[in-house]
């Protein structure tokens, strides 16, 4: 199919900012179907998303910070009510979820380039199908999309090489970040990162989702589309392989010292 214009989307996460650039997409099929096309067997209305930048989040001060309330906001409103009027915009999706998606993508893929690609593809897929999303757990949906994209990538490429995070990379903490913490989180050590690299992709995904992202076994099962017993087995075997790897390499390091 020939396109009049191609959509170019780029997500860049790290160095305390995430920048999204989306160019207009139009094609003959869209015109023929009166503004609708089909992606992944789901009808999607063609939408033009404006450029988005999160760099302005660096400018937050204590006086700008709004205390959290019990009332749902942003995507939580849409998730809780299913109200189409509350459907999040591209800007809202990115602002609220980009860093968390990138964090998961990095832990799964182990390197910045693949993490950026996975983050980009996740948000493109989310934005194209958000109109068909059934209210439930929005973050769980993001976990599922990101993880499945990672596993698809691994199957295509074979083995993914893990790399340590750059020394100057900061990450968002898991819960209730304040302005000074919003782009800061702890990093995994190089040894643990290398140990994760040694795991089969399915084990790695289960361990990352459980021990780093903090998902329950039930949530991991829903994310990976496997039974609870399979989740337990993958996590158990993955942890055992991590212990074996770390013990072996710790011994080798001690002998060479």
UniProtKB/Swiss-Prot annotation:
InterPro entries: RNA_pol_sigma-70-like (IPR039425), RNA_pol_sigma-70_dom (IPR014284), RNA_pol_sigma70_r2 (IPR007627), RNA_pol_sigma70_r4_t2 (IPR013249), RNA_pol_sigma_r2 (IPR013325), RNA_pol_sigma_r3/r4-like (IPR013324), WH-like_DNA-bd_sf (IPR036388). Keywords: DNA-binding, Sigma factor, Transcription, Transcription regulation. Residues 186-236 are annotated as: Sigma-70 factor domain-4. It comes from Mycolicibacterium smegmatis (strain ATCC 700084 / mc(2)155) (Mycobacterium smegmatis). One of its GO terms (biological process) is DNA-templated transcription initiation. Sigma factors are initiation factors that promote the attachment of RNA polymerase to specific initiation sites and are then released. Extracytoplasmic function (ECF) sigma factors are held in an inactive form by an anti-sigma factor until released. Belongs to the sigma-70 factor family. ECF subfamily. Pfam families: Sigma70_r2 (PF04542), Sigma70_r4_2 (PF08281). SUPFAM superfamilies: Sigma2 domain of RNA polymerase sigma factors, Sigma3 and sigma4 domains of RNA polymerase sigma factors. Disruption phenotype: Reduced survival after heat shock (50 degrees Celsius), treatment at pH 4.0, exposure to detergent and oxidative stress (5 mM H(2)O(2)). Additionally an inducible protective response to oxidative stress present in the wild type was absent in the mutant. Interacts transiently with the RNA polymerase catalytic core formed by RpoA, RpoB, RpoC and RpoZ (2 alpha, 1 beta, 1 beta' and 1 omega subunit) to form the RNA polymerase holoenzyme that can initiate transcription. Interacts (via sigma-70 factor domain 4) with RseA; interaction is abrogated by treatment of cells with H(2)O(2) or detergent. A motif (Polymerase core binding) lies at residues 111-114. Coiled coil: none annotated. Residues 211-230 bind DNA. This is ECF RNA polymerase sigma factor SigE.
């Amino acid at each position: 199919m020939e396109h009049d214009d191609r959509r170019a989307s780029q997500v860049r996460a790290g160095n305390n900012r995430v920048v999204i650039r989306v160019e207009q997409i139009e094609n003959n099929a869209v015109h023929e179907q009166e503004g609708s096309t089909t992606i992944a067997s789901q009808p999607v209305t063609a939408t033009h998303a404006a450029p988005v930048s999160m760099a302005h989040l660096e400018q937050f001060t204590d006086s700008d910070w709004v205390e959290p309330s019990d009332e749902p906001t942003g995507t939580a409103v849409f998730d809780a009510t299913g109200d189409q009027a509350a459907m999040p915009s591209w800007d809202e999706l990115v602002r609220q979820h980009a860093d968390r998606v990138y964090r998961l993508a990095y832990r799964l893929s182990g390197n910045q380039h693949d993490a950026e690609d996975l983050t980009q593809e996740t948000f493109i897929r989310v934005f194209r199908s958000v109109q068909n999303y059934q209210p439930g757990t929005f973050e769980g949906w993001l976990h599922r999309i990101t993880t499945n994209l990672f596993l698809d990538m691994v199957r295509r490429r074979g083995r993914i090489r893990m790399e340590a995070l750059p020394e100057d990379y900061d990450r968002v903490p898991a819960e209730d970040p304040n302005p000074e913490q919003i782009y800061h989180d702890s990093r995994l050590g190089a040894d643990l990162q290398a140990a994760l690299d040694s795991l089969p992709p399915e084990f790695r995904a289960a361990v990352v989702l459980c021990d780093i992202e903090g998902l329950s076994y039930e949530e991991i099962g829903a994310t990976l589309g496997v039974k609870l017993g399979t989740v337990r087995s993958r996590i158990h075997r993955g942890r055992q392989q991590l212990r074996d790897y770390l013990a072996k390499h710790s011994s080798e390091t001690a002998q060479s010292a």
